[in-house]
Amino acid sequence: SRIQKMSEYGVTVSYAALQSEISKCPPEEVSARVDQAIRDIIEFGKKMPGTKIGLIDANPTKGRPWQEPYRHLVQGVRAGGGHIDFIHLDCPCDAANSGRRVSWEKIKEVERFVHSLGLHFGLICTSADGGKTSDERFYKDVMAIPERYVKDRTCPDHFIIMSWYPHPSRSLPENAPEGQYPMTKTSLHFARKLANAFPNKS
């Protein structure tokens, strides 16, 4: 497998996530997909001991049921002798800002539930509008996300900044001059903003 080949080349895989395993399907197929995810996570755990394994999911973002699928997933993995470490929520900030199917309060509800299952919670930080518009718009949208957490002094265990849109159009350099916003610059400024807001959180 590709994972085994990576290990043979000396690559250490610290994190591995199943992408949209239970959300990129019709609602009536979610239960069967959860069962498949349970098998996959258990199998991955055997091949990657020491690797933190989890799920990237968008069911809350789509306004679909998520609590029972998450509970079923975690219980199934543990019952099968495997381990699951995190759930990362795929939720562009535009979706949360709109408040239609998901909101920032809903995201915090998901976070609390994931913690109640004994897992770490992560938020994928991206902007659909910004990613389709410009590097600068993506930067500004993503940099506004920490403000949603500063006032109540809480934040997810993991923030994951990514884009599958045309913007940012470049990844480097992180020290790009004023008016340029490659992905690494956005990530660095985001991390600094978090460090200033939460100095005791590593």
Language-model features: locations:
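Substrate-binding cleft of secreted/luminal carbohydrate-active enzymes
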Residues: D85-S98, H120-S202
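A substrate-binding/cap region within the structured catalytic cores of diverse enzymes
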Residues: S7, V11-A32, I41-E43, P49, ...
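Alpha-helix boundary/N-cap detector
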Residues: E28, A32-R39, P65-E68, E105, ...
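Aromatic- and acid-rich polysaccharide-binding/catalytic face
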Residues: Y9-P27, L73-R101, I161-H167
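Aromatic-lined carbohydrate-recognition surfaces of secreted/lumenal glycan-active proteins
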Residues: S1, A16-Q19, F44-R71, I84-C93, ...
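Distinct, well-ordered alpha-helical segments
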Residues: R2-I3, G63-R78, G99-E111, D135-I145
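Surface-exposed, active-site-proximal loop segments in enzymatic domains
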Residues: S1, K24-V30, P173-N175
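Acidic (Asp/Glu)-rich catalytic clusters
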Residues: R2-T12, I41-P49, V74-G82, K108-G118, ...
